[in-house]
Amino acid sequence: MAQHTVYFPDAFLTQMREAMPSTLSFDDFLAACQRPLRRSIRVNTLKISVADFLQLTAPYGWTLTPIPWCEEGFWIERDNEDALPLGSTAEHLSGLFYIQEASSMLPVAALFADGNAPQRVMDVAAAPGSKTTQISARMNNEGAILANEFSASRVKVLHANISRCGISNVALTHFDGRVFGAAVPEMFDAILLDAPCSGEGVVRKDPDALKNWSPESNQEIAATQRELIDSAFHALRPGGTLVYSTCTLNQEENEAVCLWLKETYPDAVEFLPLGDLFPGANKALTEEGFLHVFPQIYDCEGFFVARLRKTQAIPALPAPKYKVGNFPFSPVKDREAGQIRQAAAGVGLNWDENLRLWQRDKELWLFPVGIEALIGKVRFSRLGIKLAETHNKGYRWQHEAVIALATPDNVNAFELTPQEAEEWYRGRDVYPQAAPVADDVLVTFQHQPIGLAKRIGSRLKNSYPRELVRDGKLFTGNA
């Protein structure tokens, strides 16, 4: 694999020499940092099993190497990456996999280790969505996830990835993560804090990642991280699990943050060792039981993961001073909900008791039941999935609901050819050789729902959202 030149500040190299265990080679560290990062993907098991995915993609000649800490994760090698980017493959467009760095699959593996089965989870710094979607898959779209993102521009990307993967159990918020300890104390069974950090571990992906690096900056970031982990710990219920992770390598932003929390709440913090998380995990194990992953150990990004349990309640923080405002939705009455459910089933949309119908004006939404306890405590950017808009003739079903709720075995499902599916993703109407009989058509490709179409004569009218429409070369190779 080709080398690339990474910028290393001298002070950073000195710091790494001191931080690296004697069992590891500093020369190996430098060599690993100069190698470009291996590509990796995670199969979205909400849509397809790993076995079926491997069978589906077998004809492509992809080399898929299992990632030891994630059963559905694979390093991927492809011959035609330049000809067809991974993000333009049919399987990616329909949400069958997520392009995710292997190291970043570690925190969720830690969160669900030892049979942990949380019902209400918070992802404090969620964008672009790799870990939120991984959490949802581990929960099988049940329970509820609060996915927060401080950056307004990244909330939109977060929602797009959640929608593409067919996820229905997520509520999105846009807050500084330091508010949650006061706003929602002891409300969560598990919390992932993948903290903002100095990014020292990402040089294999970005050779200039350390251009603005300084020891002083690390100290400032660590101060913010301490405030974030303190807030997250307050939001965690007694007995709950908190996973703290970063993509950086210095101890000040990693071990020291966790040790600070332990010193602050000595009777309430229990470190849960990660040495048995996967075969070979002990190679990165610290004396506290954390995983400090230098890039040469597993040939991946540098990363840090700690898991801890809250063993008892801690003193509450002062109540927040902000006002949430009125919640603009109201629950749909049982009789009407039954009528809506019946109409939705007619076009192949079905849901279970984990989701409940709510209404705002002419909009119908499905919210995860597990998030209802947070209504009135935080302001949501987006909650659950938009099911439909009502109009005089019935319902206008929404694309995100089709992707999350439809099953391809519906009587109105219509399988497209590769060329027709590509036209669909380009936002164009489709003219199949033999048009379906039904007026409302569940459009599928590779037996996966990709949208809902209206049949007008021999034409299938495209309803693919404009913001998702793709240009350029797609999976058939035609531009």
Swiss-Prot record:
Origin: domain of life: Bacteria
InterPro entries in the cross-refs: Methyltr_RsmF_N (IPR031341), MeTrfase_RsmB-F_NOP2_cat (IPR049560), MeTrfase_RsmB-F_NOP2_dom (IPR001678), Nol1_Nop2_Fmu_2 (IPR027391), Nop2p (IPR011023), RCMT (IPR023267), rRNA_ssu_MeTfrase_F (IPR023545), RsmB/NOL1/NOP2-like_CS (IPR018314)
Keyword vocabulary terms for this entry: Cytoplasm, Methyltransferase, RNA-binding, rRNA processing, S-adenosyl-L-methionine, Transferase
GO cellular component: cytoplasm
Subcellular location: Cytoplasm
EC number: 2.1.1.178
GO MF terms held by the record: RNA binding; rRNA (cytosine-C5-)-methyltransferase activity
Function: Specifically methylates the cytosine at position 1407 (m5C1407) of 16S rRNA.
PANTHER family xrefs: 28S RRNA (CYTOSINE(4447)-C(5))-METHYLTRANSFERASE-RELATED, NOP2 YEAST -RELATED NOL1/NOP2/FMU SUN DOMAIN-CONTAINING
Matching NCBIfam families: nop2p, PRK11933.1
Protein name per its UniProtKB record: Ribosomal RNA small subunit methyltransferase F
Gene designation per UniProt: rsmF
